[in-house]
UniProtKB/Swiss-Prot annotation:
Monomer. The record marks 9 as: Discriminates between blocked and unblocked aminoacyl-tRNA. This is Peptidyl-tRNA hydrolase. Hydrolyzes ribosome-free peptidyl-tRNAs (with 1 or more amino acids incorporated), which drop off the ribosome during protein synthesis, or as a result of ribosome stalling. Catalyzes the release of premature peptidyl moieties from peptidyl-tRNA molecules trapped in stalled 50S ribosomal subunits, and thus maintains levels of free tRNAs and 50S ribosomes.
Amino acid sequence: MLLVIGLGNPGKEYQYTRHNVGFIAIEKIANQYNSSFSTKKKFNCEIAETISYGQKIIFIKPTTYMNLSGKSVISVKTYYNIYPAKSFVIHDDIDLETGRVKFKTGGGNGGHNGLKSIDGVIGNNYNRIRIGVGRPQNNQDLADYVLNHFSKPEYKTVMQAIDRITSNFGLILENKLEEFKNKMA
């Protein structure tokens, strides 16, 4: 069983912001596996489930806002008894240029509050699919930057990255993590 977590903030006003790139990606991946989200209040998230490559996949979008994402993750992880090593978090990363994707297992949170929240409840030995959103320019406040919408060219670049993640996601299901990592580089 795999747990796939897309990080973002609930609400239409955040839908296409840089901080919600995890939500955008997980919706596209779940859709590829003919799975749709429904709200599960007991887990504080939207959840979608499917079976592929002989294993159950649980997709979640926390509805707690970014800084409390761990609350949803620990609820689902505990209920389904999923190990952190079988968890994949998809999130925005300001330290990567827009549209760049990196895959890694474990490590620090890089100041990302959603990852801090998850680290606080399950540790940091989980997998991360980092989607670059770039850094703010001209002394723009970081919070304002990540909560702002993409420009049209940025959005196109990010969607191409998400398409690459989606088309190669089967490698994760086949436990070919190194091959997935190489495809993202």
